[in-house]
From Swiss-Prot:
Signal peptide: none annotated. It comes from Mus musculus (Mouse). The lineage of its organism: Eukaryota, Metazoa, Chordata, Craniata, Vertebrata. Residues 794-803 have a biased composition (Low complexity). In the adult, predominantly expressed in heart and kidney. In 8 week old mice, expressed in growing primary oocytes and in the stromal cells of the theca. Gene3D superfamilies: 3.30.310.270, K Homology domain, type 1, Transcription Factor, Ets-1. Residues 875-938 form the SAM domain. SUPFAM superfamilies: Eukaryotic type KH-domain (KH-domain type I) (SSF54791), SAM/Pointed domain (SSF47769). This is Protein bicaudal C homolog 1. The gene is Bicc1. Residues 1-43, 590-622, 667-702, 794-848 are annotated as: Disordered. Residues 590-621 have a biased composition (Polar residues). Residues 692-702 have a biased composition (Basic and acidic residues).
Amino acid sequence: MASQSEPGYLAAAQSDPGSNSERSTDSPVAGSEDDLVAAAPLLHSPEWSEERFRVDRKKLEAMLQAAAEGKGRSGEDFFQKIMEETNTQIAWPSKLKIGAKSKKDPHIKVSGKKEDVKEAKEMIMSVLDTKSNRVTLKMDVSHTEHSHVIGKGGNNIKKVMEDTGCHIHFPDSNRNNQAEKSNQVSIAGQPAGVESARARIRELLPLVLMFELPIAGILQPVPDPNTPSIQHISQTYSVSVSFKQRSRMYGATVTVRGSQNNTNAVKEGTAMLLEHLAGSLASAIPVSTQLDIAAQHHLFMMGRNGSNVKHIMQRTGAQIHFPDPSNPQKKSTVYLQGTIESVCLARQYLMGCLPLVLMFDMKEDIEVDPQVIAQLMEQLDVFISIKPKPKQPSKSVIVKSVERNALNMYEARKCLLGLESSGVSIATSLSPASCPAGLACPSLDILASAGLGLTGLGLLGPTTLSLNTSATPNSLLNALNTSVSPLQSSSSGTPSPTLWAPPIANTASATGFSTIPHLMLPSTAQATLTNILLSGVPTYGHTAPSPPPGLTPVDVHINSMQTEGKNISASINGHVQPANMKYGPLSTSSLGEKVLSSNHGDPSMQTAGPEQASPKSNSVEGCNDAFVEVGMPRSPSHSGNAGDLKQMLGASKVSCAKRQTVELLQGTKNSHLHGTDRLLSDPELSATESPLADKKAPGSERAAERAAAAQQKSERARLASQPTYVHMQAFDYEQKKLLATKAMLKKPVVTEVRTPTNTWSGLGFSKSMPAETIKELRRANHVSYKPTMTTAYEGSSLSLSRSSSREHLASGSESDNWRDRNGIGPMGHSEFSAPIGSPKRKQNKSREHYLSSSNYMDCISSLTGSNGCNLNSCFKGSDLPELFSKLGLGKYTDVFQQQEIDLQTFLTLTDQDLKELGITTFGARRKMLLAISELSKNRRKLFEPPNASCTSFLEGGASGRLPRQYHSDIASVSGRW
């Protein structure tokens, strides 16, 4: 084998001066002249043969050592006896150096008649042979990490070889060839030792995490890695931290370097460093890492049509980028980006897809039926090749697979050789490197369970056969290793064109979900029931596309949820749907209130299923809509406003008994606040008109939906005429908008656990989801959209048409105005329309603008009068965040807060100051300078009444009040959902 016949540079470097003659002493010593003369007549005989083979070095050394100590027969006696019994000549290395550093097995040469040679070889091998139990494993380790694995002076790899009893060979060619580097590392030894050495090598690999530190440079120099705080993090978590200034721009790249066998500490240290350097921005800064994978393996690892990588990205949440094959410089570097947990997990899964080759010898007289080989390949997800060795009476067996399937490779060897055991136990191969945290067994493999074994990698045949036949029920993860068909490699000819081969058995163990969920949920705070609902879990047994942001599968039902330390165990049972699964709305039942209450220490409020959590909510009629968009708040800190919201809702119930179903957190399909559920969805898309609704419910269910929709429509028409309900509904909406603004402006507390909920779902308060984007999404869903800016005549006709049909208002219109869609006219009296140009009409327009704004601060100016000095009158005693919120510059608030710049200091800034702060966008600087100019000019008028005449720049083009046009998929591209 190559690894045994070619000396590695490590082994060569370790050889001592006394072993320079080792090669000669390993070679057989020729017989005496008398022996050669006696054998001369037989040299030309047709029956004469000569065979050269290797014997186990350790056993031969032990034989010579025992003879030297007088405890056994010497090598001379052993070979002489065989020569006499078989009438052969045997040449063996009698001068073998005992205890030499060389691990190479010496050769024995036997000469004589063919039958005699065969008999002599059997006698020798019965004592000195271990080749039948010796294997060679070839694995991929990036050449850039070889020195890290070897260690200083070879100390790391020496210890691995001593502990495992294996010889590990690194490629010699890397020292001289600068263009092409080999990543292949060979391990030779006993199966258990080889597998243990493979896992140990993976643990020795470096783990490097990087992130970009924003806003450094002039005002904030690059942090010093020698500061006490950073040194404390470095020493506590055994990592090294370095900073590199980015050229031509602000910011710095932070690199955290640790070891794979210390993964948890590296992740914790990186999180601590992020928190220390970035503060509240830590959660928004992505972390990246990279893997060096040989370019020839990229297509294999990506899978057919990239299915393998897509599944890993969908499962972990990390972004994976393979380089352009035409790029000569970085053609082997794969980039990963995401959260700390997702990046590390995706890295593990990618390394589990690296190719692995197991080689061993088989006796020549062993014959294996090709059908048996094919069955083994299908069952064990491996490729098997058996070839005769030239000039040797044995066969060479090659087994190929991927690293996450290493155990099955040894299982294939056991079956081929007819052994009782594979020689490798599960405990031997388990390590943090070989098995990601949370997987109790290598067979619990998300890639294989999703049909992404070697078939999914695009190189296997069309047939599949499951090794596991237990019919356990479907779970969130089909976690057992579904088997696939044989891998076609270059050694077996051209690969046969195959179709996608989905797994036959989607089986899962009882612990399939309970051992996995924390892989996708980084902490207990994000593993609440609401977050599971919002995550929209697709079926992994099929290649179902991930749902658009805010859409959740219809048939996902939550049964129970238990908290055990930091791990969340849950069982999600439901119908596993094919790729065309439907997604339905997320009902705003009291689940949200239960989750909210549990976060504030209320022991009576336990998170439970829908049936126990919402005794007041109506039955399954709450899921009739086809789609609903969910707007998530930008800063979901509810500790400061949850009590206020619940108190407000309680007061609403006391003041109006008929509003018992109007509560935001208990609103269902029949609630009076139907606009809460449907604010961002098509108001006309009822159960009787939606094509998806017809597909959802067969027969009687469809009739029940129609009846519920009709009842709801009549109820809303009746309630729309009641001024009490109208005022309460408007009051609720405005109060909730104010509370939402306070929640977004509230500074997060480091020690506070912040849990996303659906409290503000569907109300359009989110700063990260502009109103214009929502309108574009509604337009994409075939909802008619009327522009907000109309001419005087269009506005007049619109007002008249709205006031002429009360029924139209009650049933909900396609207007962009929230009041009109919910049957609320200006001041509750929509039947009286004001004449064109009258103050009443202007007031109505301002109210429409107020309730159509994307957040509370955007709409304040509309309530101060058209002639008022909006900017100054709205910000009496206000602070800088509110001003930026009004100007649409909210994303720069953190920059100014970090530099401790308040409103008074802001008024003194110049264009150059803004540039030094990192405000590089011209439009943003222009808005800020205009605001500074306007506020400075009118500082004396800040406390004048609102009707003081002054010109507000916000009413002009600089304010950005004109409707902005967004691409329909801007929200998905921005990644801020």
